[in-house]
């Protein structure tokens, strides 16, 4: 397990974008069945915290570059908590869970050590790694917070040997899609499986955070601000697996 102290020299990346952080885009769709809400489609833009969670981000980016997540769906959805994905066996199309009942228990072949940085917390839209009882058992499953979930933070767990869950990114655009997807009807069992899939069409790496030049009326010289710039360039991962 790897831990990093709070840095007083700079604001938390949860609150401010930093130049060089990778940007990924989740393109998702939800085709609602009768009585199961409205269709959902669009992009969720996520900033990854490379300097604060380097092992976790590198693992996630590597899987994205392999198209690991393309074609799977969010197998666990809980309104006002999280939506979780990353099991490569969760690919069935149609009513779920009529497919493989083991969906939600699997991941990639390699696990990574737990990383914690006190600057990274479970605010609304935080992206973290799901894992088993072993803090170093995370592989490919991840979740997106629907609302603040600080009970998952390092230091806020009830058991002394539970370090919490590793945050490695945050949603910068598309929280309306997260909130809509978190409200889809689910099965009446502890697995909270959507009756119809919230489908990940693709997760793609779309450049990184770059400085933006802003012209002002008062000054002829430009000022430098930071914004999310999605570029078409290559950059060159309670929650337990069910």
Model-assigned labels for residue ranges:
Residues 1-11, 215-242:
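Secretory targeting signatures
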